[in-house]
Regions:
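Residue-level detector of the transmembrane beta-barrel scaffold of outer-membrane proteins
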Residues: 64-66, 110-114, 158-160, 245-247, ...
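Outer-membrane beta-barrel and related beta-rich outer-membrane complex signature
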Residues: 79, 125-127, 171-180, 297-299, ...
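Transmembrane beta-barrel outer-membrane domains
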Residues: 58-60, 86-93, 139-144, 227-229, ...
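Outer-membrane beta-barrel biogenesis signature
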Residues: 29-65, 167-225, 271-278, 387-392, ...
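Beta-barrel outer-membrane channel/assembly domains of diderm bacteria
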Residues: 2-4, 8-10, 18-27, 31-169, ...
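Transmembrane beta-strands of outer-membrane beta-barrel pores
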Residues: 71-77, 117-121, 165-167, 250-254, ...
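Surface-exposed coil loops of outer-membrane beta-barrel proteins
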Residues: 84, 126-140, 160-247, 252-255, ...
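Detector for outer-membrane/organellar transmembrane beta-barrel domains
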Residues: 259-462
Length: 517
């Protein structure tokens, strides 16, 4: 056993063994002379290496490599075009990272870090009818997801500093007791980057300038249910008390938020001993809030965002512009372990009081509407003997329905030139759409509302021995937009008129797998 030897003695022992084995392998020779100066140079080099390693008495850092691969074959139909892509499934993207921990020697406190990146190629959330590989992602071939250091205690919780999750991040998915959110969750990560298509326009010229995400998003992200993202800041995550955990944080520049999560098991009739693995019910829930006053959003910095909002002057400009976006969201899930039956639900609200969105509607003079969305899913997750599936792991079948209302994301990036005046989404703060923004709508309009619905069916098969999941999902989505105008070609008297804009449905089917390491 060499476990108790120093680096120097282990290398010397290995060298000696190599010399001895080599002497036998090459036939009878004189006994190897291991004395004298034969190993002096080697010892000197080892001493140099030891000087660059953690010395005895310092706290050693253990490093863990982790990650996952998640790929799918995507078949899609936008109402006219049908096609096939191979994608990186952004419901839970492929990624890898490093975690390091070290004991501080002070109670149970440990220090550590986390660095995590994801490849951006073929990101399913960024593909569309014209782009099947996302080769020119602005983040480059790799996107940094996490980069922070922390101090953690089982008793007092964990403090983080750096690029990390905001408290509300994933609040609508990470308390799901089935843990099926990596196959499909409430957002539309497989097609949100696709362009809307007008009914009756079946060629490339029939595609709108707006994407699905432009009418189904929070005011500060391209998602409707995962509004808060990962930001640069400081955060606190509590230990778990009887299933409850709390988190709060403050992030550049400026955003703050808090969240409460719960995950536990229970028995309807109690037992007097608290939660137990023998309890027949699993339950999870979470609720979170965030307030974002970052004038420049994700580009850092702050302060006034000056300059006009093209193509219109005041009052739709950025003079003394102030950001004010608020999000709150939550979820709940329950599973009956003996039968495998489960139910999941999520909700999300987002509103903006940005100074250039208040009473800024181009034709109506109204403020931006509140975005709201809800999702319900239900199914069964258990071992099935059919075709020997129970030998692999749990099998899950489920379906769901969701609705997202007024997800217009009509806010502006702010910041300094050239960002001032640019829109965060595809809809400006005054919600003005020029003629033919939506093909077939030949007059300028104001978009006052939207509705996106989705129903879905899904299958997931765990392969426990390989730490893998295989899955297949079908989704059907519909979209409606509310448009008004006072354009004289439609309203000679200048009265507010509704404008129709029928849009094609979107169907997709994807099947693939993910493996964790």
């Amino acid at each position: 056993m060499l476990g108790g030897l120093s680096l120097r003695h282990r290398v010397l022992a290995a060298t000696a063994a190599t010399v001895l084995i080599g002497s036998f392998a090459h036939g009878p020779v004189k006994a190897a002379d291991l004395g004298g100066d034969c190993c002096a140079d080697l010892e000197e080099r080892i001493a140099e290496l030891e000087a660059t390693t953690v010395r005895k008495g310092n706290k050693k850092v253990s490093v863990t490599l982790y990650g996952q691969e998640n790929h799918a074959a995507l078949f899609w139909d936008d109402g006219a075009e049908k096609n096939f892509y191979v994608v990186d499934n952004n419901y839970e993207s492929s990624r890898f990272g490093f975690k390091g921990t070290a004991k501080t020697g002070f109670g149970d406190w440990v220090g550590g870090y986390r660095l995590e990146v994801e490849p951006t190629g073929a990101n399913s959330a960024k593909l569309n009818q014209f782009d099947d590989d996302n080769a020119n992602d602005s983040a480059g071939p790799l996107n940094v997801r996490h980069s922070y250091m922390y101090l953690s205690s089982k008793t007092y919780g964990e403090g983080r500093m750096g690029l990390t999750a905001t408290p509300i991040y994933n609040i609508t998915k990470d308390t799901n007791v089935t843990e099926l959110e990596d196959t499909m969750h409430s957002d539309n990560r497989m097609m949100q980057g696709f362009f809307l298509r007008s009914k009756g326009f079946d060629n490339a010229e029939g595609l709108s300038k707006l994407k699905w995400q432009n009418i189904s998003s929070c005011y500060d992200s391209n998602n409707a249910f995962v509004c808060g993202t990962r930001k640069n800041g400081v955060a606190y995550w509590s230990p778990t008390w009887a299933g409850f955990s709390f988190s709060t944080g403050y992030f550049e520049d400026d955003e703050w938020g808090a969240a409460l999560r719960y995950k536990n098991s229970f028995s309807l009739w109690g037992g007097g001993s608290g939660a137990s693995e023998d309890d027949p019910w699993l339950v999870g829930a979470g609720i979170g809030y965030s307030k974002n006053t970052d004038e420049r959003y994700q580009t850092g910095g702050g302060g006034d965002a000056n300059g006009p909002n093209p193509p219109f002057p005041a009052p739709n400009n950025f003079r003394n512009f102030k950001r004010d976006v608020q999000d709150w969201a939550g979820s709940a899930s329950i599973k009956h372990k003996p039968t495998g039956l489960f139910l999941f639900s999520a909700f999300s609200f987002s509103e903006t009081n940005d100074t250039n969105t208040i009473h800024s509607g181009f034709y109506t003079g109204t403020s931006a509407p509140q975005m709201n969305g809800w999702d319900v899913q239900g199914g069964i997750q258990r071992d099935f003997d059919f075709l020997g599936l129970s030998k692999l792991g749990e099998t899950s079948f489920w379906g769901g329905y969701e609705q997202i209302n007024d997800g217009l994301a009509s806010v502006s990036l702010g910041g300094n030139f050239p960002d001032n005046g640019k829109n965060f989404g595809g809809i400006p703060a005054d919600r003005f759409l020029s003629a033919n923004t939506i093909i077939g709508v030949a007059v300028p309009t104001e978009i006052t509302g939207s509705e996106v619905t989705r129903w879905s069916l899904a299958f997931d098969q765990a392969v426990d021995s390989a730490n893998m999941h295989l899955y297949a999902v079908y989704q059907h989505l519909t979209a409606d937009v509310d448009l008004v105008t006072r354009d004289p070609t439609v309203s000679p008297t200048g009265k507010l008129k509704n404008v129709g804009a029928p849009l094609d449905d979107f169907d997709l089917f994807y099947t693939g797998g993910r493996i964790y390491f």
